[in-house]
């Protein structure tokens, strides 16, 4: 859990912004969203595999685009 110390004479908005930023860096909101509903282990693995395939395809397309530009 991210903790921030409110500085002296610091506006509430600034402290809230710092807290939100620290929560985002810690990945708390995405973790809460992923744990909101139960997901079967097979579904988790399937989604992870699909994202890995998508990342790989994106990487290959970037490499191919770089090769095409060289000619």
Swiss-Prot record:
GO terms for molecular function: structural constituent of ribosome. It comes from the Bacteria. Belongs to the bacterial ribosomal protein bS21 family. Residues 48-59 have a biased composition (Basic residues). Residues 60-71 have a biased composition (Basic and acidic residues). Residues 48-71 are annotated as: Disordered. The keyword Transit peptide does not apply. Keywords: Ribonucleoprotein, Ribosomal protein. GO terms for cellular component: ribonucleoprotein complex; ribosome. It comes from Aeromonas hydrophila subsp. hydrophila (strain ATCC 7966 / DSM 30187 / BCRC 13018 / CCUG 14551 / JCM 1027 / KCTC 2358 / NCIMB 9240 / NCTC 8049). It holds the Pfam family Ribosomal_S21. The gene is rpsU. GO terms for biological process: translation. This is Small ribosomal subunit protein bS21.
């Amino acid at each position: 859990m991210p903790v921030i110390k409110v500085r002296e004479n610091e506006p509430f908005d600034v402290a809230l912004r710092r807290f939100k930023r620290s929560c985002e860096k810690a990945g708390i909101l995405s973790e809460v969203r992923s744990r909101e509903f139960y997901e079967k282990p097979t579904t988790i693995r399937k989604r992870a595999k699909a994202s890995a395939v998508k990342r790989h395809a994106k990487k290959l397309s970037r490499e191919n685009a770089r090769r095409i530009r060289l000619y």
